[in-house]
């Protein structure tokens, strides 16, 4: 018997989903339906890994962002192949839950990071460490004012397990709501963690291979996790970056 199906397949890095938009859309939406049909046949639970990207660019009154926020997302941009296909995957999951009474849950991750990320990942933390190590430079895009909260995988995994096996609700944000930080300040933290004064921080324009219109802010409301599982993130950003530095120096 199969107790649980988790749909984790996808292309989450903006550089790569811009490069492969059709593959991205398929993985997040049509493959989701295939897995839902499989779960239905096997009578198993189903968990869809969605994304914080489904919220798009929330207005200030919706930050931190609750699961009930419906999103502000463009259907015709370089980011749409990812954002809208994740939304489609969520809709498929909702339909199977309601039409077929399938036991389903949706997880919306907010900027997980940690050991295992590749040097060519192109997302901000591995990218900043890679260029700091190889070029002694860190390049925040634009003015570097765009903010995120970063959740170390050590904090994320126990909550994923909790949601999969014990969660009472349908949709859960998983992330760290405590430390919203700009890309420029993140670069300064990484420079300090690296302990090398020779590392330069230089703002650059968005490269052509990077999707435009990225969200200006992203911060989750994790009240569902706090209420059900007494969730408190244990890894502060500085500590997490120190841990990632050891990994990056070894692997990058």
Protein language model features and the residues they cover:
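NAD(P)H-binding glycine-rich loop region in Rossmannoid oxidoreductase-like domains
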Residues: 1-27
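Conserved cofactor-binding/catalytic machinery of classical short-chain dehydrogenase/reductase
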Residues: 4, 23, 31-34, 45, ...
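Conserved Rossmann-fold NAD(P)-dependent oxidoreductase catalytic core, especially the SDR/UDP-sugar
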Residues: 7, 33-79
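Short-chain dehydrogenase/reductase
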Residues: 23-25, 78-90, 122-123, 149-150, ...
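Conserved active-site helix of classical SDR/Rossmann-fold NAD(P)-dependent CH-OH oxidoreductases
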Residues: 32-33, 87-94, 126-129, 158
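Conserved beta-loop-beta element that borders a ligand/cofactor-binding pocket
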Residues: 50-51, 90-115, 126
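C-terminal substrate-binding subdomain of Rossmann-fold SDR/epimerase-dehydratase oxidoreductases
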Residues: 66, 111, 132-252
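Active-site Tyr-X1-5-Lys
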Residues: 76-105, 132-134
């Amino acid at each position: 018997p199969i107790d649980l199906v988790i749909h984790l397949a996808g292309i989450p890095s903006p550089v790569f989903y811009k490069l492969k938009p059709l593959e991205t859309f398929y993985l997040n939406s049509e493959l989701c339906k295939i897995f839902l049909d499989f779960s239905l046949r096997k009578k198993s639970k189903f968990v869809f890994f969605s994304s914080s990207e489904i919220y798009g660019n929330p207005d200030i009154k919706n930050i931190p962002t609750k699961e009930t926020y419906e999103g502000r997302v463009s259907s015709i941009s370089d980011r749409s192949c990812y954002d809208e296909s994740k939304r489609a995957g969520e809709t498929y999951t909702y339909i199977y839950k309601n039409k077929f009474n399938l036991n389903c849950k949706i997880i919306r991750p907010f900027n997980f990071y940690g050991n295992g990320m590749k040097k060519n990942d192109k997302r901000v933390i591995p990218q900043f460490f890679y260029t700091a190590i190889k070029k002694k430079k860190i390049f925040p895009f634009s003015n570097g004012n765009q903010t995120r909260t970063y959740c170390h995988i050590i904090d994320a995994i126990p909550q994923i397990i909790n949601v999969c096996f014990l969660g009472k609700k349908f949709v859960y944000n998983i992330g760290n709501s405590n430390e919203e930080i700009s890309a420029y300040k993140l670069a300064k933290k990484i420079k300090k963690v690296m302990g090398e004064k020779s590392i330069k921080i230089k703002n650059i324009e968005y490269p052509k291979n990077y999707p435009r219109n990225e969200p200006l802010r992203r911060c989750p409301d994790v009240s569902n996790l706090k209420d059900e599982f007494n969730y408190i993130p244990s890894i502060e950003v500085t500590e997490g970056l120190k841990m990632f530095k050891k990994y990056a120096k070894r692997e990058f």
